[in-house]
Structures are given as structure tokens and as C-alpha cells.
């Protein structure tokens, strides 16, 4: 009986082994060194008998996935680029097809969280040996995100970058958009209204206002209907990551079926600098201006034209409807060569 079970297990592993890989590369992301790593990855995979193709076309990827004659059981996609590229690939794949991030963006927040490598040999090892695992995603007005969605001053900076971007972004590229936003942005009040449906678990829906010394689980108690949040800085996290290594919401968990909302009430430069200093020191969660909630669905609105961004990409103006998509994305556990 034991031998039979072992044979069945080996058959299942063989049946799930990756035999075809498409590398989806963003034409705007990455440097020359990164492009060389893509070429090396193609050589490595083909040398190991894995069919491999590089594409810049999401349409071509969609056609391949829709080809029932080819099947997708032993198919995987490498997303070579930044967080926006990974989210774009994920949005156009069914949940069961595994994705391997190959970080080539500016921040690479998802790749840093899961420790994915940009080195071709490591990516090849992940494709050969990585176990499948799932994570949640979010949806903002129909656009999928994996890390976070924000509205307010930081989204205005991202919008400024969107208007002037010419190729690969580096950190110093944000200097001009930051100065532009500081001179123009008026910090309108943003309102977040939670959509509490019947499927919200009373043990996990609740107000986490002000942080404090009470444990997170103890704070999430039997509060089914929360009032709106009014604030100048509005953020919702799927991962506990933000640009420049800022730990704004350290408790966000990517597999709990919830988004972690963090709002900071006051606008204008001095309040923003105060919040930034507290975030750097890890003190901001104790500030009375800070409101935290864990939600499944919400809508953000504003009386003025307030931008919002998802995973570092400008996405439009408020209003925005946001929801969590539990277990929406499959990744392969990173391995090293």
C-alpha cells in the first residue's frame, strides 16, 4: 500500500512539473543587466527541456491561456518587471496558473516580501523546484493589485510621474513629481465607507483606531457596522510593504481574506512630515490621528479631484470601489540555484 501511495504522489508531482514557461517582460521596466538575465533564463530553461518564450504582449499571453488544446496544467509565467507588471500578468491569468516574479522595477515590493530573485539561475531553480502557494489580491475599480492602493498626496506624486515618465524609473526620478505635488496639492478630505455584507465574519471586522497596547485579535470583536472614515491620507494594504521601506501597516497579511486600511486624518506639509517621522520611528500607530480597519469591501470618495494609485501605478480619480479577492493569485515558492 505504501509503495502504491508513493507512486501516486510521484505521478502527481510529475503531472504538475512545469514544462512550458512564458516570460512576460515590461518594455518600460528594467536595465540592460536585467535584460541579460532574461536571455540567460531562456537559455537555462531550454537547456533543461522546458519550452520557453518571451513576450511583451498580454494579448498573446491571453490567447495562449485560452488555447484548450495546449492546456495549462504544466504551464507557468515569469513576470519580469515591477509590481505593476506582476499585477497586470495576474489579472490576465486564471488563479491556478503559477507566476514567478522576476523583479526589475524600482521598488519590487512583492518580490522583496517573498524574497524572489532577479538572477536567472534562481528563477530557473524556482520553476523547477518551487512549491505552489496562494495569496490574496485586491481589486480597485476593476484593476487588480497585489500590494496596496492609496489615495491622496502620495498618489498625486505617482500621477506626476505618470505624466512625465520616459522609460525606466529610478528613485531620483521622483524628485520633480514630489516638488510639483507639494506646490499644487490641496489635501481634500477623503471618505472611506465600508461595505459590510452578510458574509463578513464578526470576529474579523472591526475598528483598529489608534493602535494602542490592545492586541490585534482582541480589537477585532463583534463590530459589524463601522462608520465612515474621513482623512486626508487613505491607504489599504494587502502586503505590509510601502515604497522606501516604510512600514506604514506592519500587520497586513496577504492570505487572510482582508485588506488593512490605514488613514491619517490631517493634511498639509507639516502634518505629513510629522506622520513620516513617526512612521520611521514606528510610533505612528499610537497617534490619535491614525485609524485602522480590516475590511473586505469599501468605497473611497472625495469632493474634489483626488487621484489614487495601485501598486505604484497611477489608476485614476476617486471615487474608487475596492475589494479583496481571496486566494486570487498562485506563486511558486522561491528557490536558490
List each model region and its residues:
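ATP/NTP phosphate-donor binding region
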Residues: 1-77, 87, 199
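ATP/nucleoside-binding phosphotransfer catalytic cores, i.e., glycine-rich phosphate-binding loops
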Residues: 10, 253, 263-337
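Catalytic core of DAGKc-family lipid kinases
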Residues: 46-48, 55-56, 63, 95-100, ...
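N-terminal glycine-rich "phosphate-gripper" loop used for MgATP/nucleotide binding
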Residues: 79-83
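Short Gly/Thr/Asp-enriched flexible loops that form oxyanion-binding sites at enzyme active sites
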Residues: 85-95
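Glycine-rich phosphate/pyrophosphate-binding beta-alpha loops
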Residues: 150, 154, 235-248, 314
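Gly/Ser/Thr-rich active-site loops/lids in small-molecule metabolic enzymes
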Residues: 165-172, 242, 250-270
Amino acid at each position: 500500500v505504501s509503495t502504491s501511495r508513493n507512486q501516486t504522489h510521484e505521478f502527481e508531482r510529475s503531472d504538475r512539473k512545469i514544462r512550458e514557461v512564458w516570460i512576460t517582460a515590461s518594455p518600460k521596466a528594467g536595465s540592460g543587466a536585467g535584460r541579460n538575465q532574461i536571455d540567460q533564463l531562456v537559455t537555462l530553461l531550454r537547456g533543461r527541456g522546458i519550452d520557453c518564450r518571451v513576450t511583451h504582449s498580454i494579448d498573446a499571453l491571453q490567447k495562449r491561456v485560452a488555447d484548450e488544446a495546449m492546456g495549462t496544467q504544466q504551464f507557468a509565467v515569469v513576470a519580469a518587471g515591477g509590481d505593476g507588471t506582476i499585477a497586470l500578468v495576474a489579472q490576465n491569468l486564471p488563479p491556478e496558473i503559477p507566476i514567478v516574479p522576476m523583479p526589475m522595477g524600482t521598488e519590487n515590493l512583492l518580490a522583496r516580501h517573498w524574497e524572489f530573485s532577479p538572477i536567472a539561475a534562481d528563477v530557473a531553480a524556482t520553476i523547477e523546484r518551487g512549491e505552489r502557494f496562494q495569496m490574496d489580491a485586491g481589486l480597485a475599480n476593476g484593476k487588480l493589485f497585489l500590494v496596496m492602493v492609496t489615495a491622496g498626496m502620495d498618489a498625486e506624486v505617482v500621477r506626476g510621474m505618470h505624466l512625465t515618465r520616459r522609460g525606466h524609473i529610478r528613485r531620483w526620478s521622483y524628485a520633480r513629481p514630489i516638488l510639483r505635488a507639494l506646490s499644487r496639492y490641496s489635501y481634500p478630505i477623503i471618505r472611506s465607507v465600508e461595505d459590510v455584507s452578510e458574509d463578513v465574519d464578526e470576529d474579523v471586522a472591526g475598528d483598529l483606531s489608534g493602535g494602542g497596547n490592545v492586541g490585534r485579535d482582541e480589537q477585532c470583536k463583534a463590530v459589524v457596522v463601522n462608520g465612515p472614515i474621513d482623512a486626508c491620507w487613505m491607504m489599504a494594504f494587502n502586503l505590509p510593504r510601502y515604497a522606501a521601506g516604510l512600514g506604514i501597516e506592519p500587520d497586513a497579511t496577504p492570505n487572510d481574506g482582508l485588506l488593512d486600511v490605514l488613514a491619517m486624518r490631517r493634511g498639509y506639509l507639516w502634518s505629513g512630515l510629522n506622520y513620516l517621522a513617526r512612521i520611521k520611528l514606528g510610533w505612528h500607530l499610537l497617534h490619535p490621528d491614525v485609524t485602522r480597519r480590516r475590511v473586505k469591501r469599501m468605497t473611497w470618495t472625495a469632493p474634489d479631484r483626488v487621484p489614487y494609485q495601485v501598486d505604484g501605478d497611477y489608476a485614476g480619480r476617486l471615487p474608487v470601489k475596492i475589494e479583496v479577492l481571496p486566494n486570487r493569485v498562485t506563486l511558486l515558492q522561491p528557490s536558490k540555484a
